Amino acid sequence: NNVGWLTRHLASGGLPAVVPLPATSLGNITASSLLGSSDAITMNSASDYRIDGFHWSWEEDDSANGLVGAVTRMHALWNSNATQLESAGMETMASLDLLRPINFGLYNASSNPGGYQPTGGANYELSYNSGFGDQLRNIAQLIKSNLGMRVATIDLGGWDTHVGQGNPANTYDYFGNQVESLSQGLSAFYTDLASASSGNLMARTSVIVVSEFGRRVQENADGGTDHGYGNVMIAL
């Protein structure tokens, strides 16, 4: 069985067995580090985490948080743990019930007065990769919601720069833009949690930035860098 290292950590950490939301993976697919976990929720965006695809679903009043009528009816459909499929269905419904009431949109006095307000002046509007900023904001909000989240992952792509890595002197700096987005996002996340109204949440939060492979120092013939063997990690 393919079991991720974070999944193994959760199983061996001696942590309380039951919490509402122990793990989440922000992205299109579950992070490899959380493979094998039956507790991890995978979603690209917390505000879009819903059941969709029903007739006229785009006209549903609560479409941003899930189709309430459909969700209610599906509880009866999956109301059994007799099979693995039914158990998975019940777990999905439970996660929808947990997240649907939370307003993950940004605060706006007129259009979204119940939205999320980052603290300490944290700004998740990045120069590039705006989706990364939104995902970091979602995680910060989930941490502040006291749902028991122990681990969360985000997949920030775009680092496989074999061609056209960029050169600031030529006003095209693809790699630099990637690093800028990463830096801005981490700064906003740190500021938001460190200044939380409930106290400095960064004091009990660790952030690890890791790539699946390194890159060579020497530039290749296509203005990029090829795969290397060594790599570094960033820890906050």
Which stretches of residues belong to each language-model region?
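Beta-strand elements within well-structured catalytic alpha/beta cores of enzymes
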Residues: 151-156, 206-212
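Feature for exported/extracytoplasmic and membrane-associated proteins, marking the mature portion
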Residues: 1-183, 188-198, 218, 232-236
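Histidine-centered active-site microenvironments of extracellular/periplasmic hydrolases
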Residues: 211-236
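Residues at or immediately flanking beta-strands
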Residues: 23, 204-206
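A structural signal for short secondary-structure junctions
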Residues: 146, 199-203, 225-229
